[in-house]
Amino acid sequence: MAASSLAKFAEIEIDLGRYKGNYSYLKNNDRILPTEEEIIKYYWSIPNPLWQRAFGLMAAYGISNHELFYVDLDSLLEPPGHLISTYRKNHYGIRRIYCLCPEWYKEWELYKHIDLPQVTGQNNRDLGHRVSTAFRRYGLCKPGDLRHCWAIRAMGFIPDSMAARMMAHKTQVHNDTYKRWIDENDEDRFYQLLINRSDRPKPPTV
């Protein structure tokens, strides 16, 4: 692929080739993810400010439905708003997660301290179930969809290993999970990013 060659020349850590092939790793290959426009509409449709904040954090930072309750909200008080998570800290330490749509950090006022919904649960599955139930109640997408969208948004902008760490899983799991969503539109986007770099290879002037 042309985009793969350009990525190599521009020293960007993107290997588009690995996103082709067998997609059987996913349980549901027909899963349709919401567009960013739909995510924004979902956000503004939530009448409960606590659940609106929960949705906003999950959309902006790609955290899972139970990781929501392992984050340090005070870490968002100052820009650029890197979210601190202690989820799976025994494996990955305390992690910083980037908001890849900084406009959401500002427009949704994620820097303001608003409490999360008060939910109960004996384990992560219980906590996640409470979140999933709330999403269904408000007619939203699945919580995992927001996490998938963050991962796809990260492709081409940050190294896969860094994105995987932010999501608290291994790089191979990251690649196997999200490779199926690379399409021609993504390849075209990577191409535009690469050719607009000031340090890209250029032919000599004669």
What are these regions (language model features)?
Residues 1-20, 63-66:
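N-terminal DNA-binding recognition helix of tyrosine site-specific recombinases/integrases
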Residues 33, 89-91, 167-192:
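Catalytic-site neighborhood detector that most strongly recognizes the C-terminal catalytic loop/helix
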Residues 56, 60, 145-169:
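C-terminal catalytic core of tyrosine-transesterase DNA break-rejoin enzymes
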Residues 70-107:
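Conserved tyrosine-mediated DNA breakage-rejoining catalytic core shared by Y-recombinases
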